[in-house]
UniProtKB/Swiss-Prot annotation:
Keywords: Methylation, Ribonucleoprotein, Ribosomal protein, RNA-binding, rRNA-binding, tRNA-binding. With S4 and S5 plays an important role in translational accuracy. The keyword tRNA-binding applies. One of its GO terms (molecular function) is rRNA binding. NCBIfam families: rpsL_bact (TIGR00981). Pfam families: Ribosom_S12_S23. It comes from Ureaplasma parvum serovar 3 (strain ATCC 700970). The modification 3-methylthioaspartic acid is found at residue 102. Residues 115-141 are annotated as: Disordered. This is Small ribosomal subunit protein uS12. The keyword RNA-binding applies. GO terms for biological process: translation. Belongs to the universal ribosomal protein uS12 family.
Length: 141
């Protein structure tokens, strides 16, 4: 426990919280070639690679991911949620924060239904997460 004199001499330093999605914190000014801190919830980017990855130890699957070059110059790995996708190299996508626990290095999710990423077909529940439109009502008899 510090004494009062020690606290006067040297104040308590606030704890610095480290962000879990650092690529969303910055924007790039191409006119001045400078990166500035300007956090945003979403960022757009272009897919440079689309592929599958196997998850960590207890799980087994082929998870779809894309390597995305963001508008601020960062290059990140983003998970493609839902069943089936239409993404390929040079597709324009929007990413949000949110890691995938069993994929190392994947800290972002691609937003379905935004940019070139289409919504999930035949999705009935939790549609907003997957960019699926509301199904048309069938004619009642």
């Amino acid at each position: 426990m510090p004494t009062i004199a020690q606290l006067i001499r040297n104040k308590r330093a606030p704890k610095v919280k480290k962000t879990k999605s650092p690529a969303l914190l910055f924007t790039y000014n191409s006119l001045h070639k400078k990166t500035t801190k300007n956090p945003s919830p979403l960022k757009s980017g272009v897919c440079t690679r689309v592929g599958t990855m196997t998850p960590k130890k207890p799980n087994s699957a082929l998870r779809k991911y894309a390597k995305v070059r963001l508008s601020n110059g960062f290059e990140v790995l983003a998970y493609i949620p839902g069943e089936g996708h239409n993404l390929q190299e040079h597709s324009v996508v929007v990413i949000r924060g949110g890691r995938v626990k069993d994929l190392p290095g994947v800290r972002y999710h691609i937003v379905r239904g935004a940019g070139d990423a289409s919504g999930v077909e035949k999705r009935r529940q939790q549609r907003s997460l997957y960019g699926a439109k509301r199904p048309k009502k069938e004619a009642s008899k």
